[in-house]
Amino acid sequence: MHFIKIAVFFIVISLLFTGCSVTTPKTTETTSPSVPPISSIRAQDDFYGYVNLETLQGTTLEYGQTQAGSFSNIDTEQQLLDSMTRIVSSSEVFPDGSCEQIARDAYLQYLDFQADEAAIINACHAVEAELDKINNVQSLDELMSMAEELRTDFGCVTLSNLAVTMDYFNPDEYGIAWMQATDLCGVPLEEVDENTYLAEQYEKRIIDTLRVMGYSYEAAEGVAHNLMLMIIDVAWATNFDIANAADPFSYTSFMSSAEIDAALSHLSVIDFELMAGIHDNPYGGWLIMDKGQLTAIDALFDESNLEELKALVAYDFLAQYGEYITSEHSIYEEYFPTSQESIDLQAIGYIHQIFPLVLSDLYVKAYYTDDMDQQFSRMCEDIRESYRELITDSDWLSQETRVLLLEKLDNIRFVDGGFCLEQMKDDPSLNDVFGANVFETQRNVAMREHAKSIENIGQPRNRLALGRQMHLVNACYGYDNTVTITVAIMGAPFFDANADYFTNLGGLGAVVAHEVGHAFDSSRIKYDANGVYNPLWLSAEDMAALESRNEVAVDYFENSFTVFDVYRVDGELTLGENYADLGSMECITNIASTDDEYILLFENYARIWCELTLNTNVIDQLSEDEHSPATIRVNAILATTDAFYDIYDLNEGDGMYVSPDERISRWK
């Protein structure tokens, strides 16, 4: 197998394209690096570059930007600003509890607050009052009661990582889960686990938190240093395979309260539940991801660590409400710098923070049309039907397994703009959370959300409840077998109601098919037709056949493609996403039939991944991100698609050519 040198549009001193190398002169005192312009790229050598060359050569990064492309070019901020301007300037009386009424009142409250010095000072004093309570704590019991108060009254998660969430073993129910912490006091646990000397750079904010509370610098420094040693202990006990896993929930197990109590040496199950504001647990235990980390955190609860734990609680509280103290505590300004955005955009950001689903509803009403809904619904069903054909024809799997996979396919539910419009209703009770100023409103919203989560305990879970905001450019597959496609991603080049069907199929259709493909990727394949984690739901023989394909796919993506002629993708890390891309392309090409349809589809598929990004970003992505770089998502997928060879007449020797015996498939 020869190595395919993918052309990558990154900001580097030299650009290397398949079949064409740019010789860069060595830098001397009189010469500087230069890149001759590239006028054209052959589709057969680098399809990503062939489609996107002109766009990328005309793209520049603004100051501070690290990338720009199709995803970032959808200007939802301006769309929301336009909608808000219409609402605020309107003389219409909106229904009580409507998204228009709530958004308008929150917007105006934010503007009023920013112009009211007395309100800003009052908010600062309210935060200081809570810090004084933390400062005056004299025992662990008092501190644990303080943690419960902050969780219940401010929505502040501290000392206890318990949360009411989906039961991963039964998505129609809630469960109480101990979530693995990836950081404490802003300290990335994996980073200090590997390099403890890096911990020192994170001590300053802890020191400044304590100085706000009245500690001298010397006293604050001592407490911060001791707290950092405690955090390192937690890092050493943390299983980072979980945090880095494509499917972290596969590490989850249910432990009874008695089993958890037996594992804890300092606190009890009830102690941790009370700190999370949970007074009743009908489940008789918790879902636990990382037992080792839990026991390490439990070991911190010793009276000798009281000052350090107080610092941790104060840090967590100010991480959520610290912006309100900067007017009187300048040392905290660096953590909440003055926004350079317009006051209008700041107000929209505030609404997104406290009323995200209100903003979501507002966006859907303004930008999702009946025509879009009809076209999108048709596309989703075409994609489902295409997957049905692919799975049915996968005779390398047993008939029994294919029936089960088809059942899972049929059970997939789409959460989109049309679904939101069906579920949308006015909620007058939202007016009850408005306080005298934005601080009080933020606190009241947090209190309401916590109370709602507690009410969910013991109740059935609606897996179709909206979890993603429609004003964010996003798409996702949920472990409970739902696919969410936001309205914000339904802009060009992904989707255009006035474009032809196959252009849209290569854009948004590829995204939808990608998310559906996740239902059958290397990790989600362990979840059954009802979205329940059950690695044994398929026969051992068929699971082995699927896993053998995993090994082939890992080899294909690691050994066939390079970035910068040097770096390779991590085939294991990216396997789930690569499989979703692979299944997506097989699905949408299965819908097309003519050369023109394929061309429209292929070109827009390349177009949606168009991005200009810093080379350092891409190098980091290769080691940290489960997604492959954009060029590989295009070229590596098309290089193993037979129809692509026919349309563009690929032959041995072309940059993207892969011999037939080395091409891979998800379903064929």
Language-model-detected regions and their locations in the chain:
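Intrinsically disordered, low-complexity linker/terminal regions across diverse proteins
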Residues: 356, 361-668
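Bacterial N-terminal signal peptides that target proteins for export
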Residues: 1-7
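Bacterial lipoprotein signal-peptidase II cleavage site
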Residues: 21-28
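Hydrophobic/aromatic-rich, well-ordered segments within soluble, folded domains that form packed cores
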Residues: 39-57, 192-210, 585
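Noncatalytic, helix-rich "gating/capping" subdomain that lines the substrate-entry/channel surface
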Residues: 85-383
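Active-site-surrounding "flap" and adjacent substrate/cofactor-binding loops of secreted or lumenal enzymes
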Residues: 42-46, 50-117
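C-terminal motif of bacterial Sec signal peptides marking the signal peptidase cleavage site
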Residues: 15-19
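Short, Gly/Pro- and small/polar-rich lid/capping loops
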Residues: 29-35
